[in-house]
């Protein structure tokens, strides 16, 4: 009891604020009336179908097997090999740049590794303190918010091609939203780091992220003008907004799944998509596994994302049953030009579209994603997710971590090694044993630590 009291005392500066947010969540979710079976939420824009938990084969929490624990140890090797002296981690093996999304992935991998007892407390503390201190000292785009990319060597602002830039190239609201997830874990579970988290956030003008309750990103055009644009599409938009809401930011519009929503039929499954097309809104729009997998692993979903996520999973299983092609798709780095591909359930009006960041066809690089495979395996207990797990379980470097995926056409490994892939593998395996990352008030009582034989 004395340790609990001490932790509460350390966190008192944040508890009053977070209690208010918790009450806000209680008000929102209290308005949702659960009914067995499938129900429909009537909205002005559309009807969102809600599947009951009983109809979704969710994986039950259990201890990791010895094989799964070894997989987690393999994932951690990536971070052992790619951490710089300032605490930042390379986004790609030996590539000395990182976005805030990559840094968030590292922090969540670090928390996962510690909670799975892969690293000792002093290592966790030292790594956490080092990266938080570096984040608190980052130069900011227009002195407001973190730039889209930084050198992991110098912590200076860079372009996406890792060229140093004094001004910066803008900020990503989605990336900033993601890093709020580990920040909230630190505040609630490791309150000794609350002052450092506050030190970071006091540097950032979070109000610049929002306009009319929507997420706003910043970019720089060819003339050097700063452009402020709505950021996020179905899945990612709500995921990032959810984490920012925990910090008292009004993002009620961004959290409304129904605003730009419609279903499309993908191999007999009604999958939710975003009506905001690239030609109208000058932004790419994809349906992929990742935002729904992360929402499940980190938040345990809400009733809408739980159903939308399950539809995305079902479509991928349906493609496998129809074609015999193992399917678990997401965006991934690849080990050859163009080096980054969106392998999608649906994009630009096409099912199973694979495109580059510029929207160009990349079908020849369509892949089975390691992070999507293991993420889906962690969330859903089905014969198909077991097949995904088995297919991907040897797709790694014993020295450097998990490869990004397996190419469909050749069956060869996509040997890109990234922070994001290895972080999601760690998060997924942690989820199997300990449940969602953000579990206020019940983490300590449910924590398990010993693997099965």
Task: List the model feature ranges, each with a label.
Residues 2-453:
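Ser/Thr/Asn(+Pro)-rich, low-complexity disordered segments
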């Amino acid at each position: 009891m004395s340790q609990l009291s001490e932790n509460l005392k350390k966190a008192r500066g944040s508890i009053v604020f977070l209690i208010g947010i918790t009450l806000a969540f209680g008000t929102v979710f209290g308005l949702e009336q659960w009914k067995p079976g499938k129900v429909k939420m009537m909205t002005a824009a559309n009807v969102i179908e809600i599947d009951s938990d009983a109809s979704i084969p969710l994986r039950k929490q259990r201890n990791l097997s010895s094989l799964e624990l070894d997989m987690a140890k393999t994932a951690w090797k990536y971070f052992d090999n790619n951490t710089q002296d300032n605490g930042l981690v390379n986004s790609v093996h030996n590539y000395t740049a990182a976005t805030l999304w990559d840094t968030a992935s590292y922090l969540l991998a670090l928390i996962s590794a510690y909670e799975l007892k892969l690293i000792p407390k002093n290592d966790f503390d030292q790594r956490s303190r080092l990266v938080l201190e570096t984040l608190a000292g980052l130069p900011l785009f227009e002195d407001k918010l973190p730039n889209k990319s930084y050198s992991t060597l110098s912590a200076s602002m860079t372009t996406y091609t890792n060229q140093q830039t004094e001004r910066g190239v803008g900020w990503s609201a989605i990336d900033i939203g993601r890093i709020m997830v580990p920040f909230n874990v630190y505040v609630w579970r490791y309150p000794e780091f609350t002052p450092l988290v506050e030190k970071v956030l006091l540097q950032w003008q979070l109000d610049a992220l929002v306009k009319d309750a929507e997420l706003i990103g910043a970019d720089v055009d060819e003339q050097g003008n700063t452009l402020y644009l709505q950021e996020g599409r179905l899945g990612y938009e709500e995921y990032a907004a959810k984490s920012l809401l925990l910090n008292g930011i009004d993002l009620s519009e961004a959290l409304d799944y129904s605003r730009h929503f419609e279903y499309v039929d993908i191999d007999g499954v009604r999958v939710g998509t975003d009506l905001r097309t690239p030609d109208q809104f000058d932004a790419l729009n994809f349906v992929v596994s990742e935002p729904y997998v992360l929402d499940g692993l980190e938040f345990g979903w809400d009733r809408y994302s739980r159903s939308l996520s399950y539809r995305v999973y079902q479509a991928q299983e349906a493609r496998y049953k129809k074609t015999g092609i193992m399917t678990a798709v997401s965006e991934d780095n690849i080990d050859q030009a163009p080096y980054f591909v969106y392998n999608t359930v649906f994009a630009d009006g096409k099912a199973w579209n694979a495109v580059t960041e510029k929207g160009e066809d990349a079908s020849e690089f369509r892949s089975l994603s390691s992070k999507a495979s293991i993420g889906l395996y962690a969330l859903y207990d089905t014969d198909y997710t077991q097949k995904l797990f088995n297919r991907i379980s040897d797709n790694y470097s014993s020295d450097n971590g998990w490869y990004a995926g397996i190419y469909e056409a050749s069956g060869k490994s996509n040997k890109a090694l990234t922070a994001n892939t290895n972080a999601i593998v760690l998060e997924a395996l942690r989820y199997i044993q300990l449940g969602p990352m953000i579990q206020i008030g019940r983490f300590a009582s449910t924590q398990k630590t010993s693997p099965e034989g």
